[in-house]
């Protein structure tokens, strides 16, 4: 009997060991950060995301996942490029998507941030930098007449979403594999750019190319973001297909050819756009704050598409690109061609935040009597907010208290979570999802009356 118990115990231990071995640890650093940095234990590197001062929390995006961190304003240290009045102001100054390093401590099963460092601008000597105005002149001349070699050293996936005209893609992480693609003339002007002022890939490329003996290399520090604020970019037909169409990434695809010609063959999803009707188009165009990717198509990728794209950029849109070679290049690449009637109205719906519930779905469920929902409405606002009204039947747990009150949350029911503006609800979503709860969150704003009625923005 004792032997049988011992064998069972050993087998159980073996199973636990195998399960532990199979559970791969979560990455502490975004892949792009590993190009230039190592991450010490107790640290995270990624992109700053939502900030919820009401619950003393923020989240960091690490590739396709999120980490939720708590903080105490009395003890948290925040380092930003520009000084701030206090911790709250410093955190608010960090733009969404900005690269950060966070040092944290584990307390009661939660990560508590003790240091947040916003990545500062890269340091490039004045003689090693090229400004926007000089780059504009060179791009207008072209590589042959301007005698330059422009390199986009971002990862290929980013390059395919749009690049500075005339650039070639030599990603910094694969620099050593692409040495043979550099100019034979080691005195030729080589210009590197990447993802902007905080990106180390172009300075890193500069250092490597200098070590190979190239004497005339520079960095466009503002990178693709700096170019896109002033000018249109370009992308090839295969890039359009791979980066947007195959992945079903929302975009605005504008065909500026005459309707009669375009209807004989166009890229699926295209909307016809009259080059003389920009003012009318902008009245129904998605708001610039949504940052819709825009691709403009004409017959050859020539002046017609370029002029139309320039007008969109001047109207405040970034991420505007011209299809290199136009529709002819699309056909030459043997890519799918649609015929018939093009769209006439621009419709752009940003990709929903992972885990979000649509406003219509939330409204439909929350409007039902609590006994008919079959769903838990979780309100994670603070008591000073919920005292003025809650959705009838909602479970109220302030977001900072979630981990201590898990026993109140059912594991066998769907949970729809909300706060007042979506930020704390998303923090709650990531915390509970990681624990196995069936949860979604409302990403937008909601106003709840004392009667329990609610209005969605």
Per-region residue spans from a language model:
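Short, solvent-exposed interaction modules
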Residues: 149
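Bacterial N-terminal signal peptides
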Residues: 8-17
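Rhodanese-like catalytic fold shared by cysteine-dependent sulfurtransferases
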Residues: 2-4, 21-138, 157-192, 196-252, ...
């Amino acid at each position: 009997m004792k032997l049988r118990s011992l064998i069972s115990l050993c087998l159980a231990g073996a199973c636990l060991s195998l399960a532990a071995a199979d559970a791969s640890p979560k990455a502490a650093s975004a892949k792009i950060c590993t190009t230039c940095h190592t991450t010490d234990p107790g640290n995270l590197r990624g992109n700053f995301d939502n900030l919820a001062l009401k619950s003393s929390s923020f989240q960091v995006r690490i590739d396709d996942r999120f980490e939720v961190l708590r903080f105490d304003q009395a003890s948290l240290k925040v380092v930003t490029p520009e000084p701030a009045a206090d911790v709250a102001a410093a955190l608010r100054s960090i733009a969404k998507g900005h690269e950060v390093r966070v040092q944290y401590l584990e307390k009661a099963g939660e990560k508590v941030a003790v240091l947040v460092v916003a990545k500062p601008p890269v340091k490039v000597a004045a003689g090693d930098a090229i400004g926007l105005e000089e780059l504009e002149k060179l791009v207008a001349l072209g590589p042959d007449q301007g005698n330059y070699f422009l390199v986009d050293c971002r990862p290929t996936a980013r390059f395919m979403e749009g690049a500075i005209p005339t650039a070639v893609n030599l990603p910094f992480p694969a620099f050593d594999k692409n040495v043979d693609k550099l100019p034979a003339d080691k005195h030729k002007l080589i210009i590197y750019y990447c993802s902007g002022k905080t990106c180390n890939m172009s300075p890193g490329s500069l250092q490597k190319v200098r070590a190979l003996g190239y004497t005339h290399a520079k960095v466009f520090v503002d990178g693709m973001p700096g170019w896109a604020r002033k000018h249109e970019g370009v992308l090839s037909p295969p890039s359009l297909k791979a980066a947007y169409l195959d992945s079903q990434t929302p975009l605005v695809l504008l065909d500026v050819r005459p309707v009669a010609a375009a209807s004989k063959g166009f890229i699926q999803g295209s909307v016809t756009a009259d080059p003389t009707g920009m003012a009318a188009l902008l009245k129904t165009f998605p708001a610039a704050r949504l940052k819709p990717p825009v691709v403009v198509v004409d017959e050859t990728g020539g002046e017609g598409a370029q002029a139309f794209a320039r007008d969109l950029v001047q109207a405040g849109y970034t991420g505007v690109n011209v299809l290199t070679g136009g529709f002819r290049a699309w056909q030459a690449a043997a890519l799918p061609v649609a015929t018939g009637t093009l769209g006439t109205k621009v419709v752009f719906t940003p990709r929903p935040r992972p885990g979000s519930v649509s406003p219509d779905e939330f409204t439909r469920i929350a409007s039902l009597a609590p006994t008919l929902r079959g769903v838990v409405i979780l309100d994670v606002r603070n008591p000073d907010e919920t005292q003025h009204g809650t959705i009838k039947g909602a479970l109220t747990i302030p977001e900072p208290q979630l981990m201590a009150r898990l026993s109140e949350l059912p594991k066998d029911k769907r949970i729809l979570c909300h706060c007042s503006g979506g930020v704390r609800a998303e923090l709650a979503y990531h915390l509970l999802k990681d624990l196995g709860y069936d949860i979604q969150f409302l990403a937008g704003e909601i106003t709840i009356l004392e009667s329990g009625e609610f209005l969605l923005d």
